[in-house]
Amino acid sequence: HDVSNPALANLDFMGTPPGDGTTVLPTEANPAYSYFHVERTWSEFMSSAYGQQGGAATNPEFQAQGATDIAWAAKCQDCHMRDVVGVACNKNGVPIRPDESTEHPDSGQPLHDLTGGNAWISHILASTDPNGPVYDPVNAQLLDQGPAVLTLDLNAGQTPKANGAALLAGSDRAKQQLRLAATIQNLAYSGGNVTFQLQNNSAHKLISGFPEGRRMFGNIQAKDAAGKIIYEVNPYDDTIGTLKGLPHSHSSPALGANEDYVDELVYEVHPSSSLTGEAETFHFVLATGRYKDNRIPPKGFDLARATPRISEPVWHGTSDPGYFSTQE
């Protein structure tokens, strides 16, 4: 889906209710993809080869890495609700798809798991189940303080404290999706230099979705004969939980000797805001543009389609359609 900020789009019409019959608000006259970028997963897909009429073949590497049954994709569900053998409901006489189905002889039963790429939160919630496979008493104590302390109430509804196995299974499926999403190709070493290509196997940008809390980075390590790291690009501090050497970050640890931060190998979005005067901002709700968007586009990415949808690459505050080559 595409998500945009209607409050900013309608800023010049403060106090005008939508649908009042006299004033047509910008959000009523224009598609959501045309103003104030928040998420653009749908636009990324529609600008890819997979979003064109009939879809496209998936990458051989995608299939080889575990998606052997997904050779073609033309809609989001082909990967996120993949076809399996099964029935559509638990009633008697329901045909098993696809073999027993006359209405859908060419497609299986879509698996309704809607797996994405967020493996972390499901795993953390799974760890609150005392009878589950990954119980962690520290996590359980922190998260089970009740709604008076936290907005989270682990004792309401379908509590994760009784569903650890199911939550862990969902986390594992998300990790599988992440493994399918990318392939490192053409890795070569020459004269102390390393070159490689990172291929996007998904039908949207790598990474996609809500950009404020998501990034992907390339980590390169050089080791001596004993296996000791002697040089590292984009080192990650597991204790703090972030990359080292991040500019403008108070929580990012300083780089050590023989360590480098390479921004081009950190694939992410940095919003900008003309309202706050920040070239790069954490005030996501006030974001009016993008300072950085170097996320890897999907196969067949059409800039003529992507640019009006505000999903073209951006580098240092400037729209940069040529950031990736035509071949890339």
Predicted region positions:
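Primarily the internal scaffold of c-type cytochrome electron-transfer domains
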Residues: 2-328
